[in-house]
Swiss-Prot record:
Name assigned to this protein: DNA-directed RNA polymerase subunit beta
Catalytic activity as recorded in UniProt: RNA(n) + a ribonucleoside 5'-triphosphate = RNA(n+1) + diphosphate
Molecular-function annotations in GO: DNA binding; DNA-directed RNA polymerase activity; ribonucleoside binding
GO biological process: DNA-templated transcription
Source species of the chain: Streptococcus pyogenes serotype M2 (strain MGAS10270)
Length: 1188
């Protein structure tokens, strides 16, 4: 027997064909959400408060300080928040201290700071009753970047940018004349020496001393001349910078100083963030810049006078490691003191080294480092600016390297916690202005923190983020996989990110650093391709937000691959050589072969085993969760694999789903971590179990109660239904499944079913990927799903009195009320069709709505009883089904309702949808198609043992698409069905073709895995043997019931009077200009005329035509289309005297629309009246006939 048995939870064993020993379990798949939010609660929120506070008033006599914060218990539980359309949030109380600096008086007070949404255990938020997800954002990391560009003459120029987390950009660039310029915050450029002079190093010699001799420095100094001898060089430079930043304002050196300090050196206005400081120090670090350069001077220990490295030595990695302590200490540190006019007058510490120019061995180049400021320094320092300039000047000398902005070492993830912290900071900054003003205005003696703090800007900022940010998304809840995928999504769009139109090809493309960090396959098709990605299965964020991936460390001394796991970011990995997970190893962990396949930076090639530093932990670390669920992924073309991964996320939960015969072993973990199942929190024993709840007695005697969700409506309108797995007496361990969620079976993800599939054509019905299906799948509810729709009706107070929910509805017969209770609300379990009343409701009618006769009667008799019109909630088009639940919310019951609403009724209708012609089906390999025919079981082709085939697919769908994985799955699936086993074939480490054929033989199938098929209609065998097997097929969310649409009479647009468009508006089909040309080409003038008039926007014409048809009279001539009248009115509104003349030059009067038609649906009502009138006339005619 090929393969080995593997247990997945307590309910499933699979035969696995994997060969690689997994040394690391998959991490919790939603930790990117939960860990980030926990960090925010533990430290992020505190940091935001400490950033903004303390706040002083303008005279600096009062100060508001932050002490601490505390979350109290949430007002609603999760379930209550869902039912009441509320948010699942906890009140946050912040303690402030108000200090009066003049009297020394201190007032401490706890202030309510609003309700803050709390993340559920599943990694989601509940906002206004709907489940939402905050998608992590992929953004360019703050730091310093260098780039090169070739001009039209082929000359290479260089550029550099310092990008902060917030604050002004500082850029450097060269021009064609070899002069270096700087730009501050995207303004006009100035010679870079001007900025150096403003920093207090004004002499030309001083500048040359710092940066060393080079053409760029000399050319720039010559360009930057002293224009105004009455000013010092520093003052002149400051004024020049001020002129660029604030053109047109009077320039003084003092105002320029304070402006520059605010732009770059004030931590409250300029923030590199921890990650920015880390990246700047890393890039400008002297050790990486000296690597492999030849030193041009003796390196001497200042304390002992010992020569550490002699001039002429190549600074290899080992030489640098030997003097690392000195490099990190005071080796070659120089202190430069700026002059008194400088922006910052503190001494500047730089580290300076001289190396031999790689281009010209006779020249010496100076390298200046920023002496590694402390991690806590979040603003820029003069040393950073000078070191950046040095690196930039060194690029022209062939030292250093330019950055690739698509490298994942330069792009980082902003997860939930950080996005929330940023939003909270915005709110606090708005509050700060408010607080300052109140402190200054009010009397100091009576002030308390509560009085000066207005929390509205903070709560508004948080609400706005959750409610309307591009990154706060309604959770994709089609099935557990789509939930999981959504939580692990990485988007480059959103505030501070890219836009679809500006994103070029490079940003979207797969980059070598995506390996093990971002999935190269799972991304949407269409305009967002490559901008929305998914985290790879083992991907993990470090404290700076860079994605790390795990590797097994190789002990270089012994050459063994250890089980020690090292997590590397993309730029750390660039320094190493990594071998693939499938490299053959001996028993002792050494490489079995001298040459192994590996990766170093962007190169995939063969390496000697002795140079390998790390080995991949698993073959599936490359791909995301959805992609890792595709068996035989390695045999599929990547475009089809992309479709396969995306379509699994659109699977509809079925009534009785089945896990795949051929899986990848990923199904268990995906179901476990998705949050859709019920998982045991502690060890214990089941003491009670039914469909609604499970009780487990823990070992310490306490009782855990788990509630099972039955048929709740998901965000996608599908049934979210859990099924209990455990029985009384079962022993349960922490992490075990207590109940399956939707699309799960026995603790494994089960998106579809395992039908018997044949690759064959049948009467042409599977042309162009269409799917032919057996009626068995309909009758036995194999592909049946339950869909829930929610409808609501509310009663409000109107000017004419309150609306009422009642059974007493005017002009409605008893038949229509048969399923309503005494209140007028539909009973649970009632079967309803389109147009049936769900909630009977009447609204008071104004006097203007009454006819003259009715008004007269009211004036005489004061009869106010029937002044109501019917505004009941009815079943909309396509909404028929069975009433599953009714929820009633009233003020009396203490429910929170919107202002003006007295009562709210929600009705849930369940539909059972069997598979039908027009539904979309798919396999896991991107092989999708639409059901074209459902054939009776007796007519389907059958196997020699009499088993009818369930589905027939077109064999032409395979070769050109190159997704051969489906054929391998088909054969292996048939073998698994015959053997009665389930199989796991993990991606890139699954069943080989030998394993496949061995299993086929073991199952007793023919050697080519094909079979003779018999025609169900004639009993004759087909001419050729056919590939028949079991393939996992899923039903997708694109169902024909949601798409089929037809209109005869419906609403019209208000201005143009043309029918509305789209199924949602019950609209018509657009007859566009090209369709008009087609009818013109055939000379079908009458058809064309009625399409452009009666059927569209000839208002009087269509009424008369309707009347004529109902009375059986000839249809009158059409009038003028309304849109023509609109055109005339628009031209007249421009002041043009536009008149319409007929063929005899007489003016045609264009009728105005009747006044008071303020409702799109008015014209439908007119048609209804015409119908009633017609019915009345017919009745009169029949009565007179009867009399005769």
């Amino acid at each position: 027997m090929a393969g080995h048995e593997v247990r997945y939870g307590k309910h499933r064993t699979r035969r696995s064909f994997s060969r690689i020993k997994e040394v690391l379990d998959l991490p919790n798949l939603i930790e990117i959400q939960t860990d980030s939010f926990q960090d925010f609660l533990d430290s992020g929120l505190k940091e935001v408060f400490e950033d903004v506070l303390p706040i002083s008033n303008f005279t600096d006599t009062m100060e508001l300080e932050f002490v601490g914060y505390e979350f109290k218990e949430p007002k609603y539980t999760l379930e209550e928040a869902r039912i009441h359309d509320a948010s699942y949030s906890a009140p946050i109380f912040v303690t402030f201290r108000l200090v009066n600096k003049e009297t020394g008086e201190i007032k401490t007070q706890e202030v309510f700071f609003g309700d803050f949404p709390i993340m559920t255990e599943m990694g989601t938020f509940i906002i206004n009753g709907g489940e939402r997800i905050i998608v992590s954002q992929l953004v360019r990391s703050p730091g310093v970047y260098f780039n090169d560009k070739v001009d039209k003459n082929g000359k290479v120029g260089y550029g550099s940018t310092v990008i902060p987390n917030r604050g002004a950009w500082l850029e450097l660039e060269t021009d064609s004349k070899d002069i270096a310029y700087t730009r501050i915050d995207r303004t006009r450029k100035i010679p870079f020496t001007t900025l150096v002079r403003a920093l207090g190093f004004s002499g030309d010699d001083e500048i040359v001393d710092i940066f060393g001799e080079s053409d760029l420095v000399r050319n720039t100094i010559e360009k930057d001349i002293h224009k105004n001898p009455s000013d010092s060089r520093t003052d002149e430079a400051l004024k020049e910078i001020y002129e660029r930043l604030r053109p047109g304002e009077p320039k003084t050196a003092d105002s320029s100083r304070s402006l520059l300090i605010a732009r770059f050196f004030d931590a409250r206005r300029y923030d590199l963030a921890a990650v920015g400081r880390y990246k700047v120090n890393k890039k400008l670090n002297i050790k990486t810049r000296l690597l492999n350069q030849i030193i041009a001077e003796n390196l001497v220990d200042a304390e002992t006078g010992e020569i550490l490295v002699e001039a002429g030595t190549e600074m290899t990695r080992s030489v640098i490691e030997s003097i690392e302590e000195h490099l990190d200490g005071d080796l070659n540190k120089f202190v430069y003191t700026p002059n008194d006019y400088a922006v910052v007058t503190e001494p500047v510490v730089l580290q300076k080294f001289k190396v031999v120019s790689p281009i010209d061995p006779d020249r010496v180049v100076t390298i200046v480092g920023n002496a590694n400021p402390d991690d806590k320094v979040r603003a820029l320092t003069p040393a950073d600016i000078l070191a950046e300039m040095s690196y930039f000047l060194n690029l022209a000398e062939g030292l250093g390297k330019v950055d690739d902005i698509d490298h994942l070492g330069n792009r980082r993830i902003r997860a939930v916690g950080e996005l929330l912290a940023n939003q909270f900071r915005i709110g606090l900054a708005r509050m700060e202005r408010n607080v300052r003003e109140r402190m200054s205005v009010q009397d100091n003696d009576v002030l308390t923190p509560q009085q000066i703090i207005n929390i509205r800007p903070v709560t508004a900022a948080v609400k706005e983020f959750f409610g309307s940010s591009q990154l706060s998304q309604f959770m994709d809840q089609h099935n557990p996989l789509s939930e999981l995928s959504h939580k692990r999504r990485l988007s480059a769009l959103g505030p501070g990110g890219l836009t679809r139109d500006r994103a070029g090809y490079e940003v979207r493309d797969v980059h070598y650093t995506h390996y093990g960090r971002m999935c190269p396959i799972e991304t949407p098709e269409g305009p967002n391709i490559g901008l929305i990605n998914n985290l790879s299965s083992f991907g993990h964020l470090n404290k700076y937000g860079f994605i790390q991936t795990p590797y097994r460390k190789v002990d270089r001394a012994t050459g063994t691959v250890t089980n020690e796991i090292v997590w590397l970011t993309a730029d750390e990995e660039d320094e190493y050589t990594v071998a693939q997970a499938n490299s053959k190893l001996n028993e002792d962990g050494t490489f079995a072969e001298e040459i192994v396949m590996g990766r170093h930076q962007g190169n995939n090639q063969e390496f000697s085993a002795s140079v390998v530093d790390f080995v991949d932990v698993s073959p599936k670390q490359v791909v995301a969760v959805a992609t890792a669920c595709i068996p035989f992924l390695e045999n599929d073309d990547s475009n089809r694999a992309l479709m396969g991964a995306n379509m699994q996320r659109q699977a509809v939960p079925l009534i009785d789903p089945k896990a795949p015969y051929v899986g990848t072993g990923m199904e268990y973990q995906a179901a476990h971590d998705s949050g859709a199942a019920v998982i045991a929190q502690h060890n214990g024993k089941v003491v009670f179990s039914d469909a609604e709840k499970v009780e487990i007695r823990r070992q310490d005697g306490s009782l855990d109660v788990y509630h099972i969700t039955k048929f709740r409506r998901s965000n996608s309108g599908t049934a979210y239904n859990q099924r209990t797995l455990v029985k009384v007496g079962d022993i349960v361990e922490k992490g075990d499944f207590i109940a399956d969620g939707p699309s799960m079976e026995n603790g494994e993800m089960a998106l579809g079913q395992n039908p018997v599939v044949a690759y064959m054509t049948w009467e042409g019905y599977n042309f162009e990927d269409a799917v032919i299906m057996s009626e068995r799948l309909v009758k036995e509810d194999v592909y049946t799903s339950v869909h829930l729709e929610e409808f609501e009706s509310e009663t409000r107070d109107t000017k004419l009195g309150p609306e009422e929910i009642t059974r007493e509805i005017p002009n409605v017969g008893e038949e229509a009320l048969k399923d309503l209770d005494e209140m007028g609300i539909i009973r649970i379990g009632a079967e309803v069709k389109e147009g049936d009343i769900l909630v009977g409701k009447v609204t008071p009618k104004g006097e203007k709505d009454l006819s003259a006769e009715e008004r007269l009667l009211h004036a005489i008799f004061g009869d106010k009883s029937r002044e109501v019109r019917d505004t009941s909630l009815r079943v909309p088009h396509g909404g028929d089904g069975i009433v599953r639940d009714v929820k009633i919310f009233t003020r009396a019951n203490g429910d929170e309702l919107q202002s003006g609403v007295n009562m709210l009724v929600r009705v849930y209708i369940a539909q059972k949808r069997k598979i039908k012609v027009g539904d979309k089906m798919a396999g896991r390999h991107g092989n999708k198609g639409v059901v074209s025919r459902i054939v009776p079981v007796e007519d389907m082709p059958y196997l020699p043992d009499g088993t009818p085939v369930d589905i027939m697919l077109n064999p032409l769908g395979v070769p050109s698409r190159m997704n051969i994985g489906q054929v391998m799955e088909l054969h292996l699936g048939m073998a698994a069905r015959n053997l009665g086993i389930h199989i796991a074939t993990p991606v890139f480490d699954g069943a080989s073709s030998e394993d496949l054929w061995d299993t086929v033989r073991e199952a007793g199938m023919d050697s080519d895995a094909k079979t003779v098929l018999y025609d169900g209609r004639t009993g004759e065998p087909f001419d050729n043997r056919v590939s028949v097997g079991v393939m996992y097929m899923i039903k997708l969310h694109h169902m024909v019931d949601d798409k089929l649409h037809a209109r005869s009479v419906g609403p019209y647009s208000l201005v143009t009077q043309q029918p509305l468009g789209g199924k949602a508006q019950f609209g018509g089909q657009r007859f566009g200009e090209m369709e008009v040309w087609a009818l013109e080409a055939y000379g079908a003038s009458n058809v064309l005329q009625e399409i452009l008039t009666y059927k569209s926007d000839d208002v009087t014409g269509r009424l008369k035509a309707y009347e004529a048809i109902t009375k059986g009279k000839p249809i009158p001539k059409p009038g003028v289309p309304e849109s023509f009248r609109v055109l005339v009115k628009e031209l007249q509104s421009l002041g043009l005297d536009m008149r319409v003349l007929d063929e005899d030059d007489n003016e045609v009067e264009l009728r105005d629309l009747d006044e008071g038609e303020d409702d799109d649906i008015m014209h439908v009502d007119d048609l209804e009246k015409a119908r009633e009138k017609q019915a009345q006339e017919t009745q009169e005619v029949s009565e007179t006939t009867d009399e005769k």
